[in-house]
Swiss-Prot record:
InterPro entries: PI_transfer, PI_transfer_N, START-like_dom_sf. Constitutive phosphorylation of Ser-262 has no effect on phospholipid transfer activity but is required for Golgi targeting. PANTHER family: PHOSPHATIDYLINOSITOL TRANSFER PROTEIN (PTHR10658), PHOSPHATIDYLINOSITOL TRANSFER PROTEIN BETA ISOFORM (PTHR10658:SF27). This is Phosphatidylinositol transfer protein beta isoform. It is found in: Golgi apparatus; Golgi apparatus membrane; Endoplasmic reticulum membrane. The gene is PITPNB. It comes from Bos taurus (Bovine).
Length: 271
């Protein structure tokens, strides 16, 4: 058995703008989660071409310990809380696979994302067979809804309900911002359709861990896209060449940060 959910995140930006904004925000967010022996190590970041698909391939290692729940830490052997993330970014389609060498075939997280120029109204954009699609829970994430944010995660300067972009004049996003966006021909719109498939085969813990991971994915998607929108003035003028240069610099920074300082960012204890 696997647990599948589709998260839909609507944003007041275009699919083209989001490509730069996403990569900028991933680099920044990675630095916020790295330090004290934990965090993200980038092994590869290079172009790929396979079976007619072209894009950017990344291979990252996540060194975790405080970022997993206590009931997993208690039974996990030393060194087992290391996860490999391989991603194929053939934008506007992206596929990410997370694995763990200790659990091998008994664990994976697969995140498949389509970025579409709409307001999250398309059904089954990932083309699942009808029987599988019937089992998928659809979760709508509203980046301006503070009630969807964990209290420990809230930051006023990353709140789309308060933020207004100087460069684009977008925001602040009120309670009816999606309806207003639908009726505003001057503002672009898009939706990230993120299909998350989780397998965790460990007797007695399977449903508990699968539900924990899905909850964490929703938390990550919510916080990340709130940041992305509130950082728009920092990335809206960047080119893909700027992004690749920034990624190279971030890779070196992460290696230094991970080896020193204290643990930073999201911890499972906050959940």
């Amino acid at each position: 058995m696997v647990l599948i959910k589709e998260f839909r995140v609507v944003l007041p930006c275009s699919v083209q703008e989001y490509q730069v904004g996403q990569l900028y925000s991933v680099a920044e967010a990675s630095k916020n989660e790295t330090g004290g022996g934990e965090g993200i190590e980038v092994l590869k970041n290079e172009p790929y071409e396979k079976d007619g698909e072209k894009g950017q391939y990344t291979h990252k290692i996540y060194h975790l310990k405080s970022k997993v729940p206590a009931f997993v830490r208690m039974i996990a052997p030393e060194g087992s809380l290391v996860f490999h993330e391989k991603a194929w970014n053939a934008y506007p389609y992206c596929r990410t696979i997370v694995t763990n060498e200790y659990m091998k075939d008994d664990f994976f997280i697969k995140i498949e994302t389509w970025h579409k120029p709409d307001l999250g109204t398309l059904e089954n954009v990932h083309g699942l067979d009808p029987n599988t699609w019937k089992t998928v829970e659809i979760v709508h994430i509203d980046i301006a809804d503070r009630s969807q944010v964990e209290p420990a995660d809230y930051k006023a300067d990353e709140d789309p309900a308060l933020f207004q972009s100087v460069k684009t004049k977008r925001g602040p996003l009120g309670p009816n911002w999606k309806k207003e966006l639908a009726n505003n021909p001057d503002c672009p719109q898009m939706c990230a359709y993120k299909l998350v498939t989780i397998k965790f085969k460990w007797w007695g813990l399977q449903s508990k861990v699968e539900n924990f991971i899905q909850k964490q994915e929703k938390r990550i998607f919510t916080n990340f896209h709130r940041q992305l929108f509130c950082w728009i003035d920092k990335w809206i003028d960047l080119t893909m060449e700027d992004i690749r240069r920034m990624e190279d610099e971030t890779q070196k920074e992460l290696e230094t940060m991970r080896k020193k300082g204290s643990v930073r960012g999201t911890s499972a204890a906050d959940v």
